[in-house]
């Protein structure tokens, strides 16, 4: 999931450098969303863990 966030961030940086402001903003927003979702899922898995009976 973090890999996708980094990919979207790189796409946003390239688009911003080439002057595609709207597309860069969309890619940056997608990178933020993917990153936040990844953090939330990581924290949930960290606290719940794998419980053995």
Swiss-Prot record:
One of its GO terms (cellular component) is plasma membrane. Belongs to the UPF0391 family. Its main location: membrane. NCBIfam families: PRK13682.1-4, PRK13682.1-5. This is UPF0391 membrane protein YPO0432/y3747/YP_3749. The keyword Membrane applies. InterPro entries: DUF1328. It is a multi-pass membrane protein. It is found in: Cell membrane. Keywords: Cell membrane, Membrane, Transmembrane, Transmembrane helix. The chain crosses the membrane at residues 4-24, 27-47. It comes from the Bacteria. It holds the Pfam family DUF1328. The lineage of its organism: Bacteria, Pseudomonadati, Pseudomonadota, Gammaproteobacteria, Enterobacterales.
């Amino acid at each position: 999931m973090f890999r996708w966030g980094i990919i979207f961030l790189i796409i946003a940086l390239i688009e911003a450098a080439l002057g595609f402001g709207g597309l860069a903003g969309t890619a940056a927003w997608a990178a933020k969303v993917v990153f936040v979702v990844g953090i939330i899922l990581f924290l949930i898995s960290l606290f719940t863990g794998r419980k053995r009976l």
